[in-house]
Amino acid sequence: MLLAGAIFVLTIVLVIWQPKGLGIGWSATLGAVLALISGVVHIGDIPVVWNIVWNATATFIAVIIISLLLDESGFFEWAALHVSRWGNGRGRLLFTYIVLLGAAVAALFANDGAALILTPIVIAMLLALGFSKGTTLAFVMAAGFIADTASLPLIVSNLVNIVSADFFGLGFTEYASVMVPVDIAAIIATLVMLHLFFRKDIPPTYDLALLKAPAKAIKDLATFRTGWIVLILLLVGFFVLEPLGIPVSAIAAVGAVILFAVANRGHAINTGKVLRGAPWQIVIFSLGMYLVVYGLRNAGLTEYLSGVLNVLADKGLWAATFGTGFLTAFLSSIMNNMPTVLVGALSIDGSTATGVIKEAMIFANVIGCDLGPKITPIGSLATLLWLHVLSQKNMTITWGYYFRTGIVMTLPVLFVTLAALALRLSFTL
């Protein structure tokens, strides 16, 4: 287990620190090659791992391409300007609406899209309103926080969700029926915590006249309009076609192709730039990283965790839910949520849990891996990239500040969200 653990730690360090600009895909590939050479994993493990990650990574890339195309069309800025007008000049209402917009974007376009696309738009809008640096920081932190805490409701809302749903064969409707009400509880808890934490930084009023008209944000009307149609078709497709055996990735890919074709025909959007901006390295990263994680499984780590989960399972639904959720949240915060979700899934699969207890553990693993990364900056790749985007905007958030904020806000929200899950599953007993 020591060798497998050492390879895993080396891989995680390379992925997080990215020395000399080394891409996450190549870092994970190096780890996978070391695992293969050392015998920690075997050639036969490659197709097993690929079967776990292919649908998840393809779906994620398609959703991000859709997000980038809509962003270039002005879709998200248009939405942000509209919700800012709904605030009617009241600071707390504006704060609430920006958070709710972030929740909606996270649900439909994944947490990465919400954090990375909305953040620059929010910063630009707040600068136009003449807000102070402290106020801008409050809004930006809120946008970044809700992107993860509200990425629970749909399979496509987070790469973690897709991996877990694929691993356990959860259908789109089956997943949503459990997690949509849980997500609502998470959003309410997040709103309460954000308002409490940043209460002194939210201005009482703002001047609506300083905002530009939402229509002026639209750069490509055809892509903007098609985006609405694609979104509706995607949601219908996910709920109707996925139960028929059509992969979520295929449905998302069709949506991306339609929107790309419209954008490419209009020439207002640099579609080549959009394709270059898509996270292609996530394919190599997922395969490489999960091969390294599979090495931990082969070395017996997941067997040990399965033993811990067995103890929790014996104590009933609530203990299993809270125990699994807090365990995977902690692991996500120290070793990144992408490897953690597979470690959790393998451990649950190897446990003796059955029925609603196993179901609780599966969803608690997702919650822990979605929310746990907010405790530390290294918890998710999206957070690291988000911090980099902020530094480019002359808004540096130190790791110390992030950790202090993250731990105070995440733990109560995690508690409420896991309680909501246990309550939701109590109705299926």
Curated annotation (Swiss-Prot):
Keywords: Arsenical resistance, Cell inner membrane, Cell membrane, Membrane, Plasmid, Transmembrane, Transmembrane helix. One of its GO terms (cellular component) is plasma membrane. The keyword Cell inner membrane applies. It is a multi-pass membrane protein. GO terms for molecular function: antimonite secondary active transmembrane transporter activity; arsenite secondary active transmembrane transporter activity. GO terms for biological process: response to arsenic-containing substance. Coiled coil: none annotated. The keyword Glycoprotein does not apply. It is found in: Cell inner membrane. It comes from the Bacteria. The chain crosses the membrane at residues 21-41, 46-66, 98-118, 121-141, 178-198, 228-248, 249-269, 274-294, 316-336, 407-427. NCBIfam families: 2a45, PRK15445.1. PANTHER family: TRANSPORTER ARSB-RELATED. Involved in arsenical resistance. Thought to form the channel of an arsenite pump. This is Arsenical pump membrane protein. It comes from Escherichia coli. The gene is arsB.
